Amino acid sequence: MPGSTDATMTAWTQEQSLAERFALAVTQLNRLKGVLVRVRGRVTLGGTANEMIILHRAAGVGLHQTLPLVKALLERDIKPCRIDVGQLVGAAPAADNPLASLEQIRQEANAQDHPNAPRDVVLYGFGRIGRLLARTFIERSGPAALMRLRAVVCRPGRDPVADLRKRASLLRTDSIHGAFNATIEVDEDNLALIANGNRIPFIYAPRPDDIDYSRQGISDAILIDNTGVWKNQSGLGQHLQSQGVGKVLLTAPAKGDIPNIVYGVNDEQITGERIVSAASCTTNAATPVLAVLDRAFGIDQGHIETVHAYTNDQNLIDNFHKADRRGRAA
């Protein structure tokens, strides 16, 4: 005979209780010790009890297994790091004694050199890519963060306060990713957004080569150019002339001798370059899978079809475009 409704509800209530305690422990670990907890690669910070239950079920591990691990971490001295408790529970021989494996990870984390402060990051451009990057940096901010969003650069020309309000609205809501789970305040007097405690000044500048980022306390920053306006050494090199910029990352395929890097495929080619491209969206979508297939089986030739959303420089009508494949019907 199937279990009674009361028994099912009791089991659910107990699981919810475990999930609530797990979510609280994860939050305390991040805030107090700078430890970011994952379950089989999925970030747990900021999740609700129901989200924790769904996440654990998808990972095939139980909250009764992971909760003791995060509670043990709270009781131990540990430096900022990232720990996947789902892998600890499910991996052999760690599955026999996950606490022993946890202690080994703690010792390894404490033995590593940790930066005194996260690396400064500047977003040059705040379109769709820029806003999604901002979401990621804000979501991952905290004591364990290795990078910190310090400023955003936008084109001048409109009333800056009205522009900032609109950009805050676009950051809050995305047509694909939905509402951004963050508190966003608009500091009109100082032209800045305050997102989850991160103060992000907005700099309105017409050129990339005459901005003094050090006035915002920024130094040796990674500047992420997501405008696509400049794609070669001479154009992107203008950023390096501004005070406070250490390296430049382009979020589009580059031209000339700038290396196009797909992480996990050819990132070992990054040596002393100060300007690097993250390649195209199509390249990042296809290359990691192709690289695995090529290493395992070999690829002689192939054909790739890409289905791409229209971009913001296209009309949502049947029309011409300077790039042949972009002059298409909507």
Model-derived segments and spans:
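Mobile gating loops/cap/lid regions near enzyme active sites that modulate substrate access
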Residues: 318-330
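N-terminal Rossmann-like NAD(P) cofactor-binding subdomain of oxidoreductases
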Residues: 2-315, 323
